[in-house]
Amino acid sequence: MDEQLTRTMLFDLYGDLLTKKQREYFHLHYNEDLSLSEIAESEGISRQGVWDNIRRAEEALRRTEEKIGLLERYNAQKAAAAAMETEAEELVALTEGRAGEIAEDLLRRIQELKHGI
């Protein structure tokens, strides 16, 4: 998973645990694509102050993930669902009659689960 996607997912999962300023600066920098200078100017603080808040926010998000592991579990479930989907597709292709119907139903349920993750 690329670094930007990881940061965004961690923020979505644990962002409420950050301070208000950390949340705000993180969001503005990564989600709104504002530069440190733009944020600093609008907030009336130094670029270094903005960067320190963003860095502390990232560290807090990573520490929280290390302790709780929601993103790791999400990724594991997503990989397992993809593997099950592939196996179910193979099963559908190999079976006929009632077994084929069961395999198709299984594939449909796996796909629904996968899209719900």
Task: Describe the residue ranges of each PLM region.
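Short amphipathic alpha helix immediately N-terminal
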Residues: 20-31
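Helix-turn-helix DNA-binding elements, focusing on the entry/boundary residues of the two helices
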Residues: 36
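Hydrophobic positions on the alpha-helical face of helix-turn-helix-like DNA-binding modules
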Residues: 39-40, 50
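C-terminal flanking helix
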Residues: 58-65
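Intrinsically disordered, low-complexity basic tails/linkers immediately adjacent to helix-turn-helix/homeobox/MYB/SANT
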Residues: 68-94
